[in-house]
Amino acid sequence: MGLPWYRVHTVVLNDPGRLLSVHIMHTALVSGWAGSMALYELAVFDPSDPVLDPMWRQGMFVIPFMTRLGINNSWGGWSITGGTITNPGIWSYEGVAGAHIVFSGLCFLAAIWHWVYWDLEIFCDERTGKPSLDLPKIFGIHLFLSGVACFGFGAFHVTGLYGPGIWVSDPYGLTGKVQSVNPAWGAEGFDPFVPGGIASHHIAAGTLGILAGLFHLSVRPPQRLYKGLRMGNIETVLSSSIAAVFFAAFVVAGTMWYGSATTPIELFGPTRYQWDQGYFQQEIYRRVGAGLAENLSLSEAWSKIPEKLAFYDYIGNNPAKGGLFRAGSMDNGDGIAVGWLGHPIFRDKEGHELFVRRMPTFFETFPVVLVDGDGIVRADVPFRRAESKYSVEQVGVTVEFYGGELNGVSYSDPATVKKYARRAQLGEIFELDRATLKSDGVFRSSPRGWFTFGHATFALLFFFGHIWHGARTLFRDVFAGIDPDLDAQVEFGAFQKLGDPTTRRQVV
C-alpha cells in the first residue's frame, strides 16, 4: 500500500472487524503492562518499614493504585500496613497482577481471531451489502455498559456491599486502612477530600449513564444533527473519544497534584502545598502544645509525636523538589530514612528560642537564618565572615533535641550547631542511609509528581489530537476538495463559460 507512518491507521478506516481487533490488542497491551509492572514492583518492593520507607519513597507506581482500591496483602506473607499474614486470599497483589496477565493473553487471542475473521455478518449493512457500523447505537451500548460498571463500582465495591471498600485515611495520613464507605449525598459529597463523595458520585454518574444509554438505544438522532455532527463518520467517534480522554487526564492531573480523597498521601506521598503551608508543622506544634497543656515536659510532649507525622514534615518528601530529568525513586535521592533524630530547638546566650527559616520549595540553596518568636533575626550563618553580626559564634547559639533518637542531647559546639541549623532548613531531621542504594543526595520526585507530569503532558497532546481529528471530520469535504457546487459547474448549460460561476445563466 505504501502508506507513510502517520497514515497507517487508514487501513482500519472502513474495516469494522479489524478496527475491533486493534482495539482489543490495545487492551491486551495495556493490561499486560499493568500486570507485568505490578510483578516487577512486587519483586523490588521492601515492605519492612511502612512508616519511614513507604511505597511512594520506593518509587512504586502501580502498587498505590491497587492499594487504594482495596488490595492489602501479598502471597509473600506481608501486609501493606505492616506485620505478617497467613491467608492473603486470591485477590492479593500477585493475584491481581496475574489476573491482568491472563486477561491480556485472552485479549491477544481475541484480537488475532478478529483480525483473521474480519468479514462478519454483524458488520454488514443489509441494504447496501457493504461493511458499516451503526455508530449512534454503538454509542448507546457503550454508554449503558459503562454506566452499569460505574454504578456497580460506587454501589458495591466502594460501599463494601460486595467488595473490600477503598483506602480511607485521616487528614494527616496516619491511620489509613481499607474500609467500606457510605455515600455522601449532602453538600459534603462535593468536598474533594471526603471519601463518601466517591461512592455517591459513581452511583449518580452510573445512573445517569444507564439512562442516557437507554435513551440513545431507543431514540434515533435527527437527520440534521446526524449530518451536522458527522455521526456516520468513524473519525467523529475518534475525535469525541479523544476529548473524553484528555478531559479525564486533566482532571486526574489536578486531583493528584493538589490532593484529594482519591490520592491519599500514605500511598502517593504528600503534596507540595503541604510543605508550602507548613501543614504538618502546624499539626506537630498543636500536638506539642496540647501535651504541654497536660503538664507534660517538653521532652515528653515531643516524644509523643508519631514518627510518621514528623517524616511528612521533611522537604525531601515534597514532590516538587525532584528535577524533571532526575530518574529514580526518592530513596535513590536523599537515601532511605532510618530514624528521626528528634526536634532541634535552638537558643541564643540570652535564652531566646530561635526558629530556623525553612527552605521554600523552588530553592536548591537558602541562607541559614534563625529568628525569634517575633520574627526578628537573631542569628545566621554569614556569607562573609568579616561583616557578620549574627554568626552562631557571636550570638552563642546552642541546640537541644526533644523526642527522637537524640532526645535530651544538646550541643554548644558552633560547627555542630551550624550543621543541625542547615538540616533544620529542610524540616524535621532524619538519619538517612545513602550507602545501600548508592543514593546521590539529590532530591527526587514521588509518584505523585510523575503521574501529574505524565497526565498533564498527554492531556495537552490529546487536546491537539481532538482538535485535529474534529476538524478533519467536520471539514472533510473541504480537505478532500469536493465543492458543494461541483455538480452545477459540470452541468451542461449551467454557465455561459464552462466552470465559471460568474457566468451563471439566468433561468427565465
UniProtKB/Swiss-Prot annotation:
Predominant subcellular localization, coarse grouping: plastid
Keyword check for Lipid biosynthesis: no
Cofactor note: Binds multiple chlorophylls. PSII binds additional chlorophylls, carotenoids and specific lipids.
The encoding gene: psbB
InterPro entries referenced in this protein's UniProt entry, alphabetically: PS_antenna-like, PS_II_antenna-like_sf, PSII_PsbB
Subcellular locations according to the entry: Plastid, Chloroplast thylakoid membrane
Transmembrane region(s): 21-36, 101-115, 140-156, 203-218, 237-252, 457-472
Name of the protein: Photosystem II CP47 reaction center protein
Keyword terms: Chlorophyll, Chloroplast, Chromophore, Membrane, Photosynthesis, Photosystem II, Plastid, Thylakoid, Transmembrane, Transmembrane helix
A single BP term in Gene Ontology: photosynthetic electron transport in photosystem II
Cellular component terms (Gene Ontology): chloroplast thylakoid membrane; photosystem II
Listed GO MF terms: chlorophyll binding; electron transporter, transferring electrons within the cyclic electron transport pathway of photosynthesis activity
Lineage: Eukaryota, Viridiplantae, Streptophyta, Embryophyta, Tracheophyta
